[in-house]
C-alpha cells in the first residue's frame, strides 16, 4: 500500500523515508519543493516509487489519484523561525496542512504531521495544554493554530491524526538547512574550521554554556513516528523530545571529544577543554536579550502514556554517533 512523505527531501522527511525503507517499505511517494536543488542528495540512498512537487501533489491527492494510501507523513513546511512573511507562512504551514488533513480524513488515511515546540514560545512549562502555548513568532503561530484545529477535529475523526511537537532535533541529512541546522552540526563545522567551539557566556541566571535545551536525535524522531504508524488507533498531539534538558556545554564537549577520538587523542573534561581553548565563551549578544529561551524540556508523560517506552539517546550517545556519520562523509 502507498505511503506518502511530504518534505521528503528535507531533514526529518528524508530520515523517515530511509526508516520506512529499512522496514521494507519502498512504495513511498516523495513530495517536496526542490527549488533548493541540493536537497536531492538526501534521497540518493532512498528507495521511492515517485516524486511530486508540492504544488502538484495536493489537488491530485484530493482527487484520489494515488489509490488507497495507508499514511501521509507531513513533514513539509517553512521551518525558518526568522521568516517575517506572515502570509507565506500561514499559507504554507497552516492552509496547506489543513487541506491535506481534510483529504486524509475523507480517504481514511493516517495523517502524521510535524508540529513544533515553538508553539510554547516563552512558556516555562512544556506540556500539551492550551494554557502553556504562547508562540513568539509567526512560525510558532502557524503550528499552534493548526494544532488548535486538530483538537476540534479529533473527537469526530474516523482515522488517525497525530501531531508531533519536535524539540531540538539533530542528526544526519540536515546540511541543507544552513543557519537553521542543529547546534551539533554548527559545533562540528566550527571546530574543524577553527579548532575551537564558541558558546554563549553567562546569561539569564545560567553559567557559561549552561543554557539548556531538550536535544533529540532524528533517529528517535523516526522511531516515534513509526510507532504511531504501527498504531493507527492512537491519535493526539504529543511532545517529541527526550524529556531531559542538557546544556550546550554537553553538545560542545561531545563534538570536540568525538573529533579528538578520531585523531587518536584522549577525551578531556569540560574544564580541560576550556583550559586548552578548545571551548570558548563569548559575551551574550545584546540583540538576543529578552528573546532567548535559556531552558526547554519536554514533558513526555503523554507520549509515554500512549505506550511509547523506548529509551531516548542522550546527547553523549546521539551527538557522538552523528559526528562519526559526518566524518565518514566529509573525511
From Swiss-Prot:
Pathway(s) annotated for this protein in UniProt: Nucleotide-sugar biosynthesis; ADP-L-glycero-beta-D-manno-heptose biosynthesis; ADP-L-glycero-beta-D-manno-heptose from D-glycero-beta-D-manno-heptose 7-phosphate: step 4/4
Top EC category: isomerase
Organism encoding this protein: Cupriavidus taiwanensis (strain DSM 17343 / BCRC 17206 / CCUG 44338 / CIP 107171 / LMG 19424 / R1)
Coiled coil: none
Gene: hldD
GO biological process: ADP-L-glycero-beta-D-manno-heptose biosynthetic process; carbohydrate metabolic process
Cofactor: NADP(+)
InterPro entries, per database record: Epimerase_deHydtase, Heptose_epim, NAD(P)-bd_dom_sf
SUPFAM superfamilies: NAD(P)-binding Rossmann-fold domains (SSF51735)
Cofactor note: Binds 1 NADP(+) per subunit.
Entry EC no(s): 5.1.3.20
Quaternary organization: Homopentamer.
Name listed for the protein in its UniProt record: ADP-L-glycero-D-manno-heptose-6-epimerase
Physiological role: Catalyzes the interconversion between ADP-D-glycero-beta-D-manno-heptose and ADP-L-glycero-beta-D-manno-heptose via an epimerization at carbon 6 of the heptose.
Source species taxonomy: Bacteria, Pseudomonadati, Pseudomonadota, Betaproteobacteria, Burkholderiales
Domain notes: Contains a large N-terminal NADP-binding domain, and a smaller C-terminal substrate-binding domain.
Residue positions binding NADP(+): 11-12, 32-33, 39, 54, 75-79, 92, 143, 169, 177
Protein family (similarity comment): Belongs to the NAD(P)-dependent epimerase/dehydratase family. HldD subfamily.
Amino acid at each position: 500500500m502507498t505511503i506518502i512523505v511530504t518534505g521528503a527531501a528535507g531533514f526529518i522527511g528524508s530520515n523517515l523515508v530511509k526508516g520506512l525503507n529499512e522496514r521494507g517499505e519502498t512504495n513511498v511517494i516523495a513530495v517536496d519543493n526542490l527549488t533548493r536543488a541540493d536537497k536531492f542528495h538526501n534521497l540518493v540512498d532512498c528507495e521511492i516509487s515517485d516524486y511530486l512537487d508540492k504544488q502538484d501533489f495536493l489537488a491530485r491527492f484530493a482527487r484520489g489519484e494515488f489509490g488507497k494510501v495507508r499514511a501521509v507523513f507531513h513533514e513539509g513546511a517553512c521551518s525558518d523561525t526568522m521568516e517575517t512573511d506572515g502570509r507565506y507562512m500561514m499559507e504554507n504551514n497552516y492552509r496547506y496542512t489543513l487541506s491535506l488533513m481534510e483529504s486524509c480524513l475523507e480517504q481514511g488515511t493516517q495523517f502524521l504531521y510535524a508540529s513544533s515546540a515553538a508553539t510554547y514560545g516563552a512558556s516555562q512549562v512544556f506540556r500539551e495544554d492550551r494554557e502553556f502555548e504562547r508562540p513568539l513568532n509567526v512560525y510558532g503561530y502557524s503550528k499552534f493554530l493548526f494544532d488548535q484545529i486538530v483538537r476540534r477535529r479529533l473527537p469526530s475523526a474516523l482515522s488517525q491524526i497525530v501531531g508531533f511537537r519536535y524539540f531540538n532535533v539533530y542528526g544526519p541529512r540536515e546540511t541543507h538547512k544552513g543557519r537553521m541546522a542543529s547546534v551539533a552540526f554548527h559545533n562540528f563545522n566550527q571546530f574543524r574550521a577553527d579548532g575551537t567551539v564558541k558558546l554563549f557566556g553567562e546569561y539569564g541566571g545560567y553559567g557559561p554554556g549552561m543554557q539548556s535545551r531538550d536535544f533529540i536525535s532524528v533517529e528517535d524522531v523516526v522511531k516515534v513516528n513509526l510507532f504511531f504508524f504501527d498504531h493507527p488507533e492512537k491519535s493526539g498531539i504529543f511532545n517529541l523530545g527526550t524529556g531531559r534538558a542538557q546544556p550546550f556545554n554537553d553538545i560542545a564537549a561531545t563534538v570536540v571529544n568525538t573529533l579528538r577520538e578520531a585523531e587518536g587523542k584522549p577525551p578531556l573534561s569540560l574544564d580541560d577543554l576550556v583550559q586548552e581553548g578548545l571551548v570558548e565563551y563569548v559575551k551574550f549578544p545584546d540583540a538576543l536579550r529578552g528573546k532567548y529561551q535559556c531552558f526547554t524540556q519536554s514533558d513526555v508523560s503523554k507520549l509515554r502514556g500512549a505506550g511509547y517506552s523506548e529509551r531516548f539517546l542522550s546527547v553523549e550517545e546521539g551527538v557522538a554517533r552523528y559526528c562519526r556519520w559526518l566524518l565518514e562523509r566529509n573525511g
